[in-house]
Amino acid sequence: MNGSHADFRSFFSFIAQNILMYISIIAAVAKNMAIGNENRLLYWLPNDLKRFKSLTTGHTIIMGRKTFDSLPKGALPNRRNVVLSRSVSELPGAEVFADLQTALSSCSDTEEVYIIGGESVYRQALPFANRLCLTEIDALPANADAFFPTFSPSEWKESFRECHDTDEKHEQKYSFVDYIRY
């Protein structure tokens, strides 16, 4: 059998089994879709961190190993932390899986799962996602080495937007923007 047909069937079998699972991708993106530099966020936006905590608490979060390594205190509390890694099999406070499909298969088919980065995991998860929860930052970073994948406006509809100006805690204008898949 042709390998591409088997992969295609496997993909649709996985989707059929997980049709009720709600997968959200959450990220803070600059105007050029940059998300990080040297495994660090580009901008310090306390309200973005509050929104992240509010949305993800009580849910499963899936991330790559580098994203896990970037967390100052390790696994995030009050969430099921799932890490994708082919080289590490154990991390404190987290479950480790070799690939996204296996990680998603370990989740309940009725739960909401948040994909929290990084670049490679976002790219892998985008075809499965139901919602994008983006913080769109009105800035172009001087340096960036990680980017959010491009997504087609014909596949996504803006469902929420909340704009914020600069203030004493936020040096950049930003907007919380949610998109849902058509």
Residue ranges and their predicted role:
Residues 27-60, 65-182:
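Flexible, gly/pro- and Lys/Arg-enriched active-site loops
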Residues 3-6:
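Short hydrophobic alpha-helical segments enriched in small aliphatic residues
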Residues 20-25:
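Extreme N-terminal starter segment of soluble prokaryotic enzymes
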Residues 8-14:
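Aromatic (phenylalanine/tyrosine) cluster motif
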